[in-house]
Amino acid sequence: MITIEDLKPTPGSNKKYKRLGRGQGSGKGKTAGKGHKGQKSRGTGKVRAWMEGGQTPLHRRLPKFGFKNFTKKFYAVVNLETLEEKFDSNAVVTPEVLIEKGIIDKIYDGVKILARGEITKPLTVKAHKFSEKAKEKIEKVGGKIEVI
């Protein structure tokens, strides 16, 4: 059985710390293992990750491109298959009802209805935008569309 007194560190795992810059006799005196001159021998001695010496840095060699369109609208998207699953016949679907049922978390700049999946129930759908196919499918089964 092993007891706590029997435990010893693995050989080589406890290496004694070498004090630097304490005279030539120590083996790490004078320059303390930093060599002669240069940025890395100085006080802070740090070279930033993006520093490339005199070479033009990568972020300046690469061309600029793109921008953030601040007028872009972001719509909460709902597919017909979701409406089919979550609503009964002749129900009125509004953005507020979609939030209540947990289908969308926010209205953002509006709600857009897309046509993925099939719909068999006639629903009254009120939204900010509809895809052409979604309009066709909703009206085909006797539903109504209202653009808010």
UniProtKB/Swiss-Prot annotation:
Residues 1-46 are annotated as: Disordered. GO terms for molecular function: rRNA binding; structural constituent of ribosome. Residues 31-45 have a biased composition (Basic residues). GO terms for biological process: translation. InterPro entries: Ribosomal_uL15 (IPR030878), Ribosomal_uL15/eL18 (IPR021131), Ribosomal_uL15/eL18_sf (IPR036227), Ribosomal_uL15_bac-type (IPR005749), Ribosomal_uL15_CS (IPR001196). Belongs to the universal ribosomal protein uL15 family. This is Large ribosomal subunit protein uL15.
